Regions:
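C-terminal substrate-binding/catalytic core of Rossmann-like NAD(P)-dependent dehydrogenases/reductases
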Residues: 172-177, 218-267, 275-276
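Glycine- and other small-residue-rich loops at beta-strand/loop junctions that grip anionic moieties
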Residues: 92-95, 119-123, 143-145, 164, ...
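Glycine-rich beta-strand-centered segment in the early N-terminal region that forms part
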Residues: 1-52, 64
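C-terminal hydrophobic helical "lid"/dimerization subdomain
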Residues: 149, 197-200, 205, 244-293
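Hydrophobic beta-strand signal
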Residues: 17, 36-37, 59, 119, ...
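Mid-domain Rossmann-like dinucleotide-binding core that forms the NAD(H)/NADP(H) cofactor-binding site
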Residues: 87-168
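Glycine-rich cofactor phosphate-binding loops and adjacent beta1-alpha1 units
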Residues: 110-114, 153, 157-232
Length: 293
């Protein structure tokens, strides 16, 4: 359930990139041919919009032009993060920008610039994006705990200082012994009560447990006696203005080869074979799936 979606059927999707084919007469921020992220289908009589990126054509909103014109444009804040990609960036890399910008901006909101040790729970694309972005921000000692050996191997390729198979009790104990209230930051990309509680064993005084995952259900349930002198911060939802600010550094990192998109995108399909892409996600054989029109 997502509270922003109140009517079904709905068009899902927000991790998309496409070329501008037509612009309105008052548009100043985009031109035909620009590669732009986060286009989407708006609400209409047939479908509601759950960001609406799963479509061949979408709409972007010129936030700057609307503000300058003092225009009343519905959902204009969506335009804050609908940004132009640099010349030479491929659409596949551009489609990864959303995950990377959301995680990079979350790290900025948490405040990690002077931190030394980070633990990430989870080994999916969001966890690996946090790893990549934290490395860009200067954190060198980053550990990843997950349940899939192949994805942990990818984490090592992306620069993790160490990885642990979370479902293996022996490896889990090694992690507990290593982190034992010594981590500056714990990033929970799963968001269950179990994983939040697991972070309690790792975080040091004045540290921060940052919950990004959405799996905690209706209620947060953690043992109160364990809550001592650290923060639990929820960063599950991006702040558009902060996400927009990190567009350039994330784009630069991709263009400079500091983030290897090929380590994230494991499956590519034509839109005609979209069911294969969804199945790869369901089977957990994929990290990121790209569907091309």
């Amino acid at each position: 359930k997502v509270r922003e979606v109140t009517r079904y059927p709905a068009v899902l999707g927000h991790e998309d990139a496409g070329r501008v084919v037509k612009i309105g007469k008052k548009v100043t921020s985009f031109k035909v041919g620009d590669l732009v992220v986060r286009a989407g289908q708006p609400d209409n009589e047939k479908f509601s919009s759950a960001w609406g990126g799963f479509a061949e054509y979408g709409i972007v909103k010129d936030y700057k032009a609307a503000m300058a014109d003092q225009a009343d444009v519905k959902d204009i804040n969506l335009g804050i993060t609908q940004q132009v990609c640099p010349e030479g960036m491929q659409a596949e890399a551009a489609s990864m920008l959303i995950t990377l910008k959301e995680t990079y901006s979350a790290l900025k909101r948490i405040g990690v610039e002077d931190k030394k040790k980070m633990v990430i729970l989870g080994d999916g694309p969001v966890a690996l994006a946090f790893l990549s972005c934290a490395k860009l921000m200067g954190i060198q000692e980053i550990y990843v705990l997950g349940n899939h050996r192949d994805k942990l191997e990818t984490a090592e390729k992306l620069g993790a200082a160490g990885t642990f198979l979370n479902k293996d009790e022996e490896e889990k104990k090694k992690a507990s012994d290593l982190f034992d209230r010594k981590s500056d930051i714990c990033i929970d990309t799963i968001g269950s009560n179990q994983t939040i509680t697991q972070c309690l064993d790792y975080i040091k005084e004045t540290g921060t447990i940052a919950v990004y995952g959405l799996k905690s259900g209706e209620n947060l349930n953690v043992p109160l006696p364990e809550l001592r002198n650290f923060n639990i911060q929820y960063v599950q939802w991006p702040v558009p203005e902060v996400e927009a600010e990190v567009h350039k550094p994330v784009c630069d990192a991709i263009m400079d080869g500091k983030i290897d998109i090929d380590l994230f995108v494991t499956h590519r399909f034509s839109i005609d074979d979209y069911e294969k892409g969804f199945q790869a996600v369901k089977d957990r054989t994929a990290l990121k799936v790209v569907l091309n029109f």
